[in-house]
Amino acid sequence: MNDLNRLGRVGRWIAGAACLFLASAAHAEPGENLKPVDAMQCFDCHTQIEDMHTVGKHATVNCVHCHDATEHVETASSRRMGERPVTRMDLEACATCHTAQFNSFVEVRHESHPRLEKATPTSRSPMFDKLIAGHGFAFEHAEPRSHAFMLVDHFVVDRAYGGRFQFKNWQKVTDGMGAVRGAWTVLTDADPESSDQRRFLSQTATAANPVCLNCKTQDHILDWAYMGDEHEAAKWSRTSEVVEFARDLNHPLNCFMCHDPHSAGPRVVRDGLINAVVDRGLGTYPHDPVKSEQQGMTKVTFQRGREDFRAIGLLDTADSNVMCAQCHVEYNCNPGYQLSDGSRVGMDDRRANHFFWANVFDYKEAAQEIDFFDFRHATTGAALPKLQHPEAETFWGSVHERNGVACADCHMPKVQLENGKVYTSHSQRTPRDMMGQACLNCHAEWTEDQALYAIDYIKNYTHGKIVKSEYWLAKMIDLFPVAKRAGVSEDVLNQARELHYDAHLYWEWWTAENSVGFHNPDQARESLMTSISKSKEAVSLLNDAIDAQVASR
């Protein structure tokens, strides 16, 4: 630390006391005051934090605002951590100063369709259950709703915990503030005395695992080693009992997932993303080396017991395309199988926490590189991928992305308060709710009705292609039992299964991706037409083989 920073320490401490006064008023118990600590004492050990804190916008915020280190200071030494400080993970730690952002985050968008299945006749993917047969998502796959509910909705979804966790009552399903302040203020556990994964309700599954939860929360950030590897200092890992892990988690989408709490600078914390961008050298924009070079990510590794333990990724500049990609991305969050021999890939394998960081047309090769597939279809036996919300990769190369548009421009616009202050909305909602700040901000020649019309044009067209893809996939699936009964050879069936993989991939990407093609309409059209072609090819192959078998009798 240079002398200039040391001389500025008193000024930073005094300014930080102002925030501390506000913090004590908002969060302390009656009669309790937050007593600032000497940050220089903390920096004696936490040298990496010093580098970030002293030069960032949070330089005036004292350590005690987020940490209770009373016992830690008394028991720590240069060789031993001592009693670990208590670190605040709740979003209200930031709300003291960033009130407007917090209030917008907890605001529920009541215009959305809560818990609407994607697999209903009028929804996005009417034949989803048939096409995904054999996978846990067939038990429930709903449209997304407000981010405030992202953790609690994971706990209650029918495919995850067998119905163990439920809302305390139906009124709680609207309680965005409660869901943000603590999941267990709105949820109940059917059997708090047990931790085994089992079915409490019929027509449910127990498919959850610890990696799933890394998108929903980072409450466990200090207890999780890099990539979820087992480590003697880690309380949780990829192989932990997921029910016990779930009970230890409370808050959705912690502020520090995107904002470094010490510097206030932009960052990411999802280890799978850091691994893809930095460790594997794919960069922030794999299809645009120039942009990837401009938007760099620096991996910062923290040690525990003098061993590398966890890591964060500091961004050169704020880029919501990268920050949102911590969750809005296709990645492995489950066990699976090897393409080469069908052997099981367990949660102890790093492939169970893997970001492919590839678009729909590069995914197959990326999966082959790590020798992985997710599940076998219950009817055809084909080895298939199971795709998760690949918004980031879909956006790459689109007209909007090439013109410098980022996620926040459309989903988190700048909003002016009554006092004239401008802040970034953290409501993360559809541009339909704020066309003036989103679409019309660039398309000034349009009216709001024209912009909505263009959106509907793209999404309606894409949805039509999704439905056609499903029709031909279903037709192909229905032919497999017929072909088997007719005595069609395994060689022909395997050829059809390979076509099934392609048809499934190029279809399901667009049921998992949440824009119904709007993020990249040209890519959606090409992909879905490819799916239809592959299904038709398989249908023709199977029909010809069936006819040949019948004729030979």
Swiss-Prot record:
Residues where Ca(2+) binds: E330, Y331, K386, Q388
Residues annotated as binding heme 6: C212, C215, K216
Residues where heme 2 binds: C63, C66, H67, H262
Record's subunit section: Homohexamer. Dimer of trimers.
Cofactor: Ca(2+); heme
Chain positions of cross-link 3'-(S-cysteinyl)-tyrosine (Tyr-Cys): Y331-C333
UniProt-recorded name of the protein: Cytochrome c-552
pH-activity note: Optimum pH is 7-10 for nitrite reduction, and the optimum pH is 7 for sulfite reduction with only 20% residual activity at pH 7.8.
Enzyme class label: oxidoreductase
Activity regulation, short description: Inhibited by azide and cyanide. Subject to competitive inhibition by sulfite.
Keywords (A to Z) from UniProt: Calcium, Electron transport, Heme, Iron, Metal-binding, Oxidoreductase, Periplasm, Signal, Thioether bond, Transport
One MF term in the entry's GO annotations: heme binding
Family under the similarity heading: Belongs to the cytochrome c-552 family.
Residues that bind heme 1: C42, C45, H46, H72
Source domain of life: Bacteria
Post-translation changes: The thioether cross-link between Tyr-331 and Cys-333 may play a structural role in the active site cavity. Besides, it may lower the pKa of the Tyr hydroxyl group. An additional covalent bond between Tyr-331 and Gln-388 has been observed in some protein crystals, but this may be an artifact that is due to the formation of tyrosyl radicals when the protein is exposed to oxygen.
Record: residues binding heme 4: C255, C258, H259, H426
Presence of the UniProt keyword Acetylation in the record: no
Organism whose genome encodes this protein: Thioalkalivibrio nitratireducens (strain DSM 14787 / UNIQEM 213 / ALEN2)
Pathway listed: Nitrogen metabolism; nitrate reduction (assimilation)
Phylogenetic lineage: Bacteria, Pseudomonadati, Pseudomonadota, Gammaproteobacteria, Chromatiales
Classification via InterPro entries: Cyt_c552 (IPR003321), Multihaem_cyt_sf (IPR036280)
Signal peptide bounds: 1-28
Binding, heme 8: C407, C410, H411, H519
Predominant location: periplasm
Cofactor binding, note field: Binds 1 Ca(2+) ion per monomer.
Entry note: thermal dependence: Optimum temperature is 80 degrees Celsius.
